[in-house]
A protein has these predicted regions:
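N-terminal pre-domain/capping segments
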Residues: 2-94, 101-105
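Active-site-proximal loop/turn and secondary-structure-junction residues that shape catalytic pockets
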Residues: 28, 46-50, 66-68, 86-88, ...
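Acidic (Asp/Glu)-rich catalytic clusters
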Residues: 32-38, 59-82, 98-113, 157-160, ...
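Conserved, mostly hydrophobic/aromatic
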Residues: 42, 115, 201, 231, ...
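Gly/Pro-rich active-site loop or hairpin
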Residues: 53-64, 69, 137, 143-147, ...
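Active-site acidic/histidine proton-transfer and metal-coordination neighborhood
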Residues: 95-197
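Acidic/histidine-rich catalytic cores of soluble enzymes
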Residues: 158-242
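C-terminal helical cap(s) of enzyme catalytic domains, especially alpha/beta-barrels
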Residues: 283-307
Length: 309
């Protein structure tokens, strides 16, 4: 049976309070140097540490020297988890097994506590190119054909990685026609078929609830919460009447409310990760990052007061 890597920091999912982590960005370097103990783990985006020369090239991938040296230094002091952005596991026309093998190679190198990706499509077939990168995660219609497709790909991915894959719920700004089941029913069926885990992004869910007009709490009630291994929390902002998943600094109160309501119900929750875009670091500041970590700990273990500044 596929297992997570055991960690002296994170332990085994479901055996104690969830760990508190940060999505790494360059603006965090100073804080992590001064306070390496402020976070239990770091989540990294592997694709930002290597160069992809394209499917026709051999060798196709090469580590970026400066970025990889930084990652090696981070790995000396922090437990790492991987959060991929390029797999495009739900693309109907293409599936990139070389990308999976590259991720597996990095898993062997860094022994990620777990690996996650997005339940989405970023690559599509167009008239101009059979493998066009859309530049953003595209929304999906939840149907049985897609379930069959993604189930097969998740199984192959987990076999190559040698570990369980977590899949993250995405962002939708407008209704998507063509579904014959709910997103939660789709995810629950995928978990049953493949044994994969769930990365529940609470801010993504809030974005969808605001823009599409549904109740986020009721949405969560329909999800198999025993499959949730990681959660993401983040902030956003409004633009032209639409609420965006912009990772714009501190989390809104609605995200904290969802975390406090949901985390105790997730029996296998291993970690909660705060993510923000580094362009918002001047406004958030290091104290702001520490405050977000404090609030995460308070939500997970209410008797925790704060992290010393």
């Amino acid at each position: 049976m596929l297992q997570f890597s055991e960690s002296p920091i994170l332990g085994i999912p479901g055996t104690g309070p969830a760990a508190v982590g940060l999505m790494f960005n360059g603006a965090l370097a100073g804080l992590l140097d001064a306070r390496p103990d402020c976070t239990d783990f770091l989540s990294i985006i592997p694709e930002r540490f290597w160069q992809d020369f394209g499917r026709s090239q051999r060798p196709r991938f090469a580590p970026l020297p400066d970025e990889t040296a930084l990652l090696d230094r981070l790995a000396e002091r922090h437990r790492l988890v991987a959060h991929g952005v390029g797999l495009s596991i739900a693309s109907g026309s293409t599936f990139d097994l070389d990308h999976v093998r590259q991720l597996a190679e990095w898993h062997r190198r860094y022994d990620f506590a777990w690996i996650s990706e997005h339940l989405s499509a970023v690559r599509v077939r167009t008239e101009e190119t059979p493998d066009h990168h859309a530049g953003l995660a595209l929304p999906l219609a939840w149907d049985h054909d897609l379930l069959d497709l993604v189930s097969e790909r998740v199984a192959r991915t987990q076999d190559i990685l040698g570990t369980r894959l977590l899949l993250e719920n995405g962002v939708v700004h407008t209704p998507v026609p063509g579904s014959d089941m709910s997103e939660q029913d789709f995810v629950n069926a995928l978990v049953r078929r493949t044994g994969c885990g769930v990365l529940l992004d609470l801010h993504n869910l809030l974005v969808n609830a605001i823009n599409l007009g549904f109740d986020a709490g009721r949405w969560i009630d329909g999800l198999d919460l025993a499959a949730v291994v990681e959660m993401h929390v983040a902030g956003g902002n409004r633009l032209f009447g639409v609420y965006l998943d912009s990772h714009a600094g501190a989390c809104p109160q609605s995200v904290w409310d969802l975390l406090a309501r949901t985390a105790p119900r997730c029996s296998n929750l291993a970690g909660v990760t705060f993510e923000y875009h580094e362009s918002y670091h001047p406004a958030l500041g290091e104290d702001g990052v520490l405050d977000q970590l404090d609030r995460m700990r308070q939500a997970l273990v209410p008797e925790v007061v704060h992290v010393d500044r």
